[in-house]
UniProtKB/Swiss-Prot annotation:
It comes from Baumannia cicadellinicola subsp. Homalodisca coagulata. One of its GO terms (biological process) is amino acid biosynthetic process. It catalyses: 7-phospho-2-dehydro-3-deoxy-D-arabino-heptonate = 3-dehydroquinate + phosphate. This is 3-dehydroquinate synthase. Transmembrane segments: none annotated.
């Protein structure tokens, strides 16, 4: 069992990683006999794993209520938050309750947002079931819902009590979702760890084949990187900003194409290629490494070119609303070389010229 700590004073918590954790009663600290929980999950995950989770919680003497939501990014909305609140209120959950987020990134965001706001904050345990949520979104406390005009526009940072990662859950993950998660994995190598990027080049086929040791090691390495970043910069005022690599255009694609039509990792992969190519054209990122990034993304089953139906002008409203834009100045994350990146600032008009040939 791997245990990674995020040290944030009284909000510190552990990420626990091991195959079979879902059936290990010692995983569910700090729950105790007689505690009350609301399990928030999706139809798909409920059909596969809810019986297993319910059985272990029942054996621990935990009182379980359920809130089962539809699957898909299009449901990451305030309407679903209201459903969670209603489930909590109807069953008389008070401020010592615990919400369990049992699912992928959408469920983690919804449950986390609800936990942050219900009775001004209740405990939440994250049990991520997709690669993307295991390596990224379940760690660090970011929670948000979408708005028709932009992704993740309504949210907060609210740390979980613990994160329980069972890589066995990936056995039922659709291949497209697995590839989507690999975009965030590759992002870590580009940003912070050239040796990890090199390792990914050697092991991408084993990851796609869900080779157990390889997958578990990969998840652990990603969580180690994310934990270090979050511990240093919880509220994204410094180094944590770098984790937004590729997300400005990624979020624009997801929103413009309709939530759920492009998966998050697919859109981020395109966003990564845009900034890598810009960095190369500016003389930072080498041609050789640009091709390495492109090749690895393609091998992971990810797109490297955005949808043809989005024009340069179509992107503009999303860029103007992006959290990294202030007073017409876009703060963009540019990789300088494999394992290193920094934030550069451009007027939106200047940036549009830089990427015109890439859209």
């Amino acid at each position: 069992m791997d245990r990674i700590s995020i040290t944030l004073g009284e909000r510190s918590y552990a990420i626990i990683i091991a195959n079979g954790l879902l059936q290990d009663p010692t995983s569910f600290w700090p729950l105790a006999r007689g505690d009350k929980v609301l399990v928030v999950t999706s139809n798909y995950i409920a059909s596969l794993y809810l019986e297993i989770l319910s059985q272990i919680l029942t054996e621990l003497g935990i009182i379980i209520d359920l809130c089962i939501l539809p699957d898909g990014e299009q449901y990451k909305s305030l309407a679903m938050i209201d459903k969670i609140f209603t489930a909590l209120l109807k069953k008389y959950h008070n401020n010592d309750t615990t919400i369990i987020a049992f699912g992928g990134g959408v469920i983690g965001d919804l449950a986390g947002f609800a936990a942050a706001n219900y009775l001004r904050g209740v405990r939440i345990i994250q049990i991520p079931t997709t690669l993307l949520s295991q390596v990224d979104s379940s760690v660090g406390g970011k929670t948000a819902v979408n708005h028709p005009l932009g992704k993740n526009m309504i949210g907060t940072i609210y740390q979980p009590t613990s994160v329980i990662i069972d890589p066995n859950c990936l056995a039922t993950l659709p291949r497209r979702e697995l590839s989507s998660g690999l975009a965030e994995v590759i992002k870590y190598g580009i940003l912070f760890d050239v040796n990890f990027f090199n390792w990914l080049e050697l092991n991408i086929d084993a990851l796609l084949g869900l080779e157990p040791h390889t997958v578990t090691w990969c998840i652990r390495r990603c969580c180690e990187i994310k934990a270090k970043i979050v511990t240093a910069d919880e509220h994204e005022k410094g180094v944590r900003t770098l984790l937004n690599l590729g997300h400005t255009y990624g979020h624009a694609i997801e929103t413009h194409m309709g939530y759920g039509n492009w998966l998050h990792g697919e859109a981020v992969a395109v966003g990564i290629m845009i900034v890598v190519q810009v960095s190369c054209s500016l003389g930072y990122f080498s041609n050789v490494d640009t091709e390495r990034v492109k090749t690895l993304l393609l091998r992971a089953g990810l797109p490297v070119i955005g949808p043809m139906k989005i024009s340069l002008e179509d992107y503009l409203p999303y860029i103007m609303r992006d959290k990294k834009t202030t007073n017409g100045i876009l703060h963009i994350i540019l990789p300088l070389k494999l394992g290193s990146a920094e934030v550069h600032t451009y007027r939106i008009s200047e940036w549009q010229k830089l990427i015109a040939h890439l859209i």
